[in-house]
Amino acid sequence: HFRLAIMNTDVRRGVRIKKEEIMAVDFENSQTKKNLEAAFAGESQAHTKYEYYASKAKKEGYVQISNIFTETSGNEKEHAKLWFKYLHNGEVPTTAVNLADAAAGENYEWTDMYAGFARTAKEEGFTEIAAKFALVGAIEKAHEERYKKLLSSVEDGSVFSREGVKVWKCLNCGHLHVGATAPKVCPTCNHPQSYFEEQVVNY
């Protein structure tokens, strides 16, 4: 809880007594939390926007300006991370928590947000935008399903283990390992198991 201390005095029998009145504010219901959420949203938006600006400046031949936009975008990203961590007890949550949160966010986007946006755009005569809202909503649905599947893999310990023989690829050096489970350590570059993924050939 954030606490505000207010000092005042009380006079009793000629003795000046200092009292401290403590007003406790629950963080979850505080204006400060709302301000942190607004700050996180604003900085995140600025980070993304400046990346677009940097790309445009570079295309127009302003390399120095592009670099400044890129640098500032990085600053905004760190500002956003600072506020995000305050909103989550001083740290980024675990991957399992993040996957669950991401799935919930994607669910809201495709079931509520984009569905409503598409309906409104269509009613207002913006048919192209309505169609784009609907198409992106379908993508968000796929995102939700992917996050849920990944969360299930984290929870049941199958991220680095599969039924049957699989080919695992080290994302650092490209080493290929055949087996049901990825090796604990890459025998070629010594990177940990976390660098392995099941190889999927799509060419």
Task: Show where each model-derived region lies.
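Short, low-complexity, charge-dense intrinsically disordered segments
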Residues: 10-17
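Non-heme di-metal
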Residues: 22-203
